[in-house]
Each structure stands twice: as C-alpha cells, then as structure tokens.
Amino acid sequence: MRVYLIDGLRLNDYNKLENYLDKHLESSPLGGIYWLKLDQEILTDIQKEHNDCHSHVFALMLEETSLSSEFLVRITKKIQCDCMACATKEQRIWLMEQVDAIFEKLDIHI
C-alpha cells in the first residue's frame, strides 16, 4: 500500500497535531487514528452513488514521531464495500494538500 508519511516530528509537534486533530476531526475507536472526510467534489462516481456508505475518509495515523495516511479511501460505516478503493491521483493530491495545510496552520516545519 502506498502511503503519505511525514516523520521526524518533535514532541511539541506531536502535541500540537494531537490537539488540533482531537478538536477538528472525528477519531477512530483505535487510539491515534483520525478520519479526514473527503470533499464530495473529488469522490469517484461509485463513491458518490453509495449514499449509505458516506462519509468517505482517509485514515490519518498520528504517532509520536510521525503522521501517515495510506492512499486508501475508506468508509466508517462498513467493513468492506466496492466504494472503498485506492485513492485517485486527485484524491492523493487533495490529501497531501490538506495535511500540508494543517502543518502550515500549526507552524510545524519538517
């Protein structure tokens, strides 16, 4: 699986990210995982058709020294569905831009 990985976080960076993600994103029952909801405009046709599966998300995994996300569009309501898929190029770029914007907002420079 391809991933977007930012490593080399300092403890202060980790704390800022954890506070921000706790405040702005839904968290998974598994600690350190947050759901970043995709914009409707970048969903694939099948993802748009699957209203029962919304929201489509990327899973951000925060660890003490890194933040990562698989390039996999997931759903939170079911274990598996045809609308779960590897991210398109547009979705991958969107994810990286969203994460980079969070780092910029929090003044984290890696």
Task: Describe each model-derived feature in a short phrase.
Residues 11-12, 40-43, 64-67:
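Short, charged/polar surface micro-motifs in flexible loops or helix N-caps
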Residues 3-5, 33-37, 57-59, 66-68:
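Ordered hydrophobic segments in well-structured contexts
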Residues 19-27, 101-108:
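Short, intrinsically disordered, mixed-charge
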